[in-house]
A protein has these predicted regions:
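Periplasmic-binding protein-like
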Residues: 1-18, 120-161, 185-187
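Second-shell loop/turn segments in exported
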Residues: 5-6, 49-57, 81-82, 149-153, ...
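A ligand-binding cleft/hinge motif common to bilobed small-molecule-binding domains
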Residues: 67-70, 96-97, 101-128
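Short helix-initiation/N-cap motifs at beta->coil->alpha
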Residues: 76-93
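An extracytoplasmic/periplasmic, membrane-proximal ligand-sensing/linker region
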Residues: 152-210
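A conserved helix-loop-strand patch within extracytoplasmic ligand-binding domains
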Residues: 1-57
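Hydrophobic residues within well-ordered alpha-helices
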Residues: 45, 95-96
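Secondary-structure junction motif
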Residues: 57-67
Length: 210
């Protein structure tokens, strides 16, 4: 819609991966279809050159593969033209130059790199004018505090609740914020086991690739 995504001060328990179309003719063709409300076909996507990360990258390979699998029964491994990049910066440079038609990355890639698009990456116009999102994955829940089901101590539900509440309360203090900032975390919420169904699917996908 002509605007770059904005960061938020609100706490989030997940992030998403996106499929980003670039300024090449093919990239703009795919973006135009999406903006017109048309469904992309597998042939549409397979006709593009993709810039991807290594197969262990959550946002740069695994979750985009799950997105493809859910819609087309395919993964990144099935694409005819998928080029592995050594960094997201490399993928962006390939996208800007037209070497790649689409790339996959963490969702805030444009927020982080809009300024560098023209100055350092080779874009010929503002990033918001040359790129567009054509796909968004399921949430990626990559940070959590977990417990072992084999622990006798953790069998006590009251203890688990008290421990969880302690982490939540500690993260709300200035001292706690300083401690948890080491992990780039700003707070905690109670989780839902169903939130991690996507991660279970990701693990199954990884097994199938081995």
């Amino acid at each position: 819609d002509g605007t770059i995504e904005e960061n938020t001060d609100a706490m989030s328990t997940y992030y998403r991966s996106i499929i980003l179309a670039g300024p090449s003719a093919k990239g703009q063709e795919l973006l135009a279809k999406v903006n017109n409300g048309e469904e992309l076909t597998w042939d549409d996507l397979n006709s593009a050159t993709w810039a991807v990360m290594g197969p262990t990258s959550a946002s740069g390979y695994i979750y985009p593969s799950l997105w493809l699998q859910e819609r087309y029964g395919k993964t990144i491994a099935d694409l005819d033209n998928a080029v592995q990049s050594d960094s997201y910066t490399t993928s962006l440079a390939r996208l800007a130059s037209g070497q790649a038609d689409v790339m996959v990355s963490f969702g805030h890639i444009r927020t982080k790199n809009a300024k560098d698009w023209k100055e350092k990456l080779g874009g010929t116009d503002e990033m918001v004018n040359q790129t567009g999102i054509i796909g968004v994955t399921e949430p990626i829940y990559n940070d959590m505090i977990a417990y072992s089901k084999n622990s006798e101590l953790m069998q006590d539900e009251d203890f688990r609740k008290a421990l969880g509440d302690s982490f939540i309360e500690l993260a709300e203090t200035d001292e706690g914020k300083e401690i948890f900032s080491v992990f780039s975390q700003i707070g905690y919420e109670w989780g839902d086991d169903a939130n991690y169904d996507g991660e279970r699917a990701a693990q199954e996908l990884l097994k199938s690739l081995n």
